[in-house]
Amino acid sequence: MTSDPGSALQHRKRRHIDVCLTEAVDYQSLTTGFERYRLPYNALTQTDLHSVDLSTEFLGSHLRAPVLIGAMTGGAALSGIINRNLAAAAQQLGIGMMLGSQRVMIDDEAAAASFEVRGVAPDILLIGNIGLAQLRSSMVPGLAAALDRVGANGLAVHTNPLQEAMQHDGDTDFSGSIGRLCDVAGAIGYPVVLKEVGHGIGAAAAAELVGCPIAAIDVAGAGGTSWARIEQFVRYGDVRYPALAEWGVPTAQALTEVRQMLPDVPLVASGGIRTGMDAAKALAMGARVVAVARPLLAPAVESVEAVVDWLQRFIDELLVCLHGCGAANLSALRGRGVTELP
């Protein structure tokens, strides 16, 4: 008798949730690098705090604040509760959301319900998700149908070679994946965001994307949640390869390198973005929006209100950061820049 691959995938998705809620899954020594930068403080700011404008446009959608709920989960029964609570919070706050990988939804019809959030979030920017390792041009019709089914506005393609290498039976053949990415991005009919999962996109990877018809890049740098660490907990029950769990391009470095290599491509900064100050620094360094994922997991298990509370504090801190450096809007913030400490 053969095992059901869909059921196995759903089980792994639930294990990911459990590990993220109960184990130490952040990088233990590697940091995002944002501590090396300071946002300029202006004691003579000429802004009115209550008039500071955080709104922006991303992938053709208007956001009340430059914040996305990052990709987390899908497929398990609990995933549906988490995703609906996250989406409802995004609807209340006027921000966007990335879904977890829809591979399980494509493989198993029963998993589709965990991704369907439009009932509670009819107006949000909603970004679907698929893995680069699994991406094939032949998938375009089925993938487009999956995006249509959930009412997505775009597609995130996540590249995760280190995570896959740590995963039991991971998809470790990435040969030809850049060409497939560019082919699908040109054919799918949705704006495509290339993203990492928390080990970072740096200069070498960005150089490979020149001319590729992607709409944005989520640098998803190192310093927050380590998926190489998570997969080792899932596979072994502990961290058997600690050096690999601490490997990646720190978020601030990733943001700087990709911005320099691809100056016209909109960037998402994620990976260890934990505070409004982190977000302000990332935006001042050239990100169009920021994304936050794992800090919202426990609140999302609890309630919509818990997610809204966490995000509102995050957004309020970001608002004060703009006010304190004399920036009335996000364009002005980018003009302020940051100071790198010696």
Swiss-Prot record:
Enzyme class, UniProt record, top EC level: isomerase
Binding site for FMN: A71, M72, T73, S101, N129, K195, T225, G272, I273, R274, A293, R294
UniProt-listed GO biological process terms: isoprenoid biosynthetic process
GO MF, one annotated term: magnesium ion binding
GO cellular component: cytoplasm
Cited SUPFAM superfamilies: FMN-linked oxidoreductases
EC number: 5.3.3.2
Cofactor: FMN; NADPH; Mg(2+)
Family annotation (NCBIfam families): IPP_isom_2 (TIGR02151)
Annotated family: Belongs to the IPP isomerase type 2 family.
Subunit and interaction comment: Homooctamer. Dimer of tetramers.
HAMAP family, A to Z: Idi_2
The name this protein goes by in its record: Isopentenyl-diphosphate delta-isomerase
The species this protein was found in: Mycolicibacterium vanbaalenii (strain DSM 7251 / JCM 13017 / BCRC 16820 / KCTC 9966 / NRRL B-24157 / PYR-1)
Lineage: Bacteria, Bacillati, Actinomycetota, Actinomycetes, Mycobacteriales
Gene giving rise to this polypeptide: fni
